[in-house]
């Protein structure tokens, strides 16, 4: 077999088989059909991290990948707390989880991107680099996140933390790409962000009439888990990869025998990410009501049972961050997170407050988003820290992190926002708004009869609600310090120049929250006759 490929007019055609059909351009993934079930799939992976062999020629034709630092530059102890700027707990909780993602933090602290970045403004990677550097190098303090981090997303009210998380991840991925508009999907899959968070699904359909097999590979950055019938993350993953029978009206139209026939469909993870983002689907898309049930999740998770290739030994991930939502629906509540510092100690990051936490407390939360990293990756970064010079350990006086100068007390949530450090934060213009981004997400999806995120009340045009309680009545009893306050818009609303240009964002839900039974990308088919 020849190990080469041809690039013709935007189409990738592989010369690995005797007969090929023309592939459609601008494909997000490839579909391969075979006439019989082989003993070993020709698309099997040599390693979990790289693309499968038959897709490798595509990756080799692309620009070189950004290299991740081999050694850790991350301080061992926990960093700063984050000031709540008014309904921004969802921003703070998400940022803390990203800040304590070892591969991302080490890359940011190396400053490799900013030294070669050609964007004069609006670069999310540069903005995140400034934030992560400040957060990790200011233990015992409370810092104000840059307004540019949420520009185009935050509208003065609470939003969904997972949506903001993927908004940020997608913006960082776009910042890795060249400046020109037309970039193929394969280039996006070689970015720094895809190296850290990305992997590939393998959707395999076997025709029960001719035994032909169709393999479809689809990239992912996070994994959404249905928890309605699951008591644990492992059960939710088992349901996700459980074979599905296609028959009757749902019969499969086989591209080999060219007829509708019963088939078996199996979804598995073909390549594993360095960092897994597992999203527990707690909110109804229609009503916004929350599934407020306890779903067990382990400190160590073996992903091998859910991979395409078996019998290759355990693939162990360790938990390092948990994003928690406290409340009863997406319309109310409060977000905070737990993170694991490089030293191994867990901390609760609740806006400005940073307190030490036990693993028992971490594992007993009603988690919304779970962050796992491959055990080998975590150990590599931990060993690098232990060999290097560590900052001072977290003392008892730092356990409850509140600002010592101009202390941020929760009974005084109304604070005048200080000016941002100009040498750390870029000024940019806003092109993409949250409304536009959500419109792009929903344009191919059937919309409900009413808007579940509709603002129920109308405020005067000259006021802004600061950190309004999402618990309604319940928050007043348990968190009186988080009740609503008002701040003049003239002192808190970012100017047009302070907003960040994130560009036009592609649909995240159709890609990040992949449904088991649907293909949400255009496909290109390669018909193989053996």
Swiss-Prot record:
Gene Ontology biological-process annotations: protein deubiquitination; proteolysis; regulation of apoptotic process; regulation of protein stability
GO cellular component terms, A-Z: cytosol; endoplasmic reticulum; nucleus
Disordered: region residues: 382-411, 477-530
An annotated Gene Ontology molecular function: cysteine-type deubiquitinase activity
Start-end of Polar residues biased regions: 493-505
Domain of life: Eukaryota
Residue ranges, compositional bias (Basic and acidic residues): 382-392, 398-411
Enzyme superclass (EC): hydrolase
Catalytic activity: Thiol-dependent hydrolysis of ester, thioester, amide, peptide and isopeptide bonds formed by the C-terminal Gly of ubiquitin (a 76-residue protein attached to proteins as an intracellular targeting signal)
Principal location: nucleus
Active site: 89, 334
Protein name: Ubiquitin carboxyl-terminal hydrolase 17-like protein 17
Organism, as annotated: Homo sapiens
